[in-house]
Amino acid sequence: MDFDKSSSSLVLDLAWNQVDKKNQDFIYAKDFPALIMSIEEILSRGQQTPLAFLSNTGKSVIDTFAREKEFFKIYRDEFKEIFHGLVGKTFKDTIEGTNVSRSVLDEQGQEPDVSTTPTRQQRSSPRKVNRLLKNLETRVASMKDELKFKDEILAEKDRELIQLTRKLSDYKDKYEFVQRQFSFYKDHGESPRRNSSESEQLNLEQNASTKHEFIISELKRKLQEQTLAISNLKEQLQRGEGAGVLYTNYSKRYNPLHNDGPMVLVLATLVFLTIILLIGSMIWVTGGKDDSNSFSQYSWWENNSLLSRIGWFFRDWSDTGVDYVNFEPSSDAYERIMGIRRI
């Protein structure tokens, strides 16, 4: 026999109402087998022998899906599509394959004739609308919760990405520093060779001298970067960009240094250089003459990283008679660490 489009939907509605007790308009995948059993019960009513709605293979596939996707939500309007994907046959064709009589479906719950019971149909419409609205509100709330959960995951991933980016930048800076240090030591290790009769103390002095020269070169590089940054700020202030644009008329009237931004930068730079000169002079004066244990004992200012760099900068700058010797042991050590083989 031929079934119209509402026949399969009628069977689904009858079975769905038996499983979806809360009228949520969806069921979980774990309730899928129960829905299939309800459909078989509806189709078997009035029959002498129970009708087989699905084959054993189809039931096995649905049972496996229910176990693996236990809390997967199956909405009413998506059921037929999911059923077709699992069984490989449309829900309508499966109903027709049971050869159930249409009279059985009419007895189980065919919609009443609108012309005979208009009052009942009108009274049920508001309830149906309210139920649909309630289902939609529930579904929207569920989707909002899922969206909030996904937003939290995205925020966490963004924080992890920022941390990884910072670590990558730190590692890059460290790598560039080690690369500059290696190149500097290697260049000094390629200086003219000395006789093998030179003392070990001279080699130690050369090691310390090379180390201090590298520190001085790093300070010079930093100073150049700061000078370039100051120049850029001056250009921005002259063009009216930067922090000067944010000042109000009140600050222009009562702040005498407002319209003289470059002068403020120059004054700050002079104060900073004056402090460095004072500290360097004090260290140079109190350093005294070097003795045989000068490289094994540290002065009070050498215990501080900043004071040590400034002090050695002025002491090495004032000492222009340093002779360079071969730095073969340190060069060999760097080549072993970096995995460089000589050709």
UniProtKB/Swiss-Prot annotation:
Protein's job: Component of the spindle pole body (SPB) required for insertion of the nascent SPB into the nuclear envelope and for the proper execution of spindle pole body (SPB) duplication.
Ranges in a coiled coil: 127-243
Keyword Protein biosynthesis attributed: no
GO annotation, cellular component aspect: cytoplasm; nuclear membrane; spindle pole body
Name used for this protein in its record: Monopolar spindle protein 2
UniProtKB keywords: Coiled coil, Cytoplasm, Cytoskeleton, Membrane, Nucleus, Transmembrane, Transmembrane helix
Family in the record: Belongs to the MPS2 family.
Positions of the UniProt region annotated as Disordered: 102-129, 187-206
Organism: Zygosaccharomyces rouxii (strain ATCC 2623 / CBS 732 / NBRC 1130 / NCYC 568 / NRRL Y-229)
Residues spanning the membrane: 264-284
Keyword match Transmembrane helix: yes
Ranges of biased composition (kind: Polar residues): 113-124
InterPro entries reported for this sequence: Mps2
GO biological process: protein localization to spindle pole body; spindle pole body duplication
Compositional bias per record (Basic and acidic residues), positions renumbered to this chain: 187-197
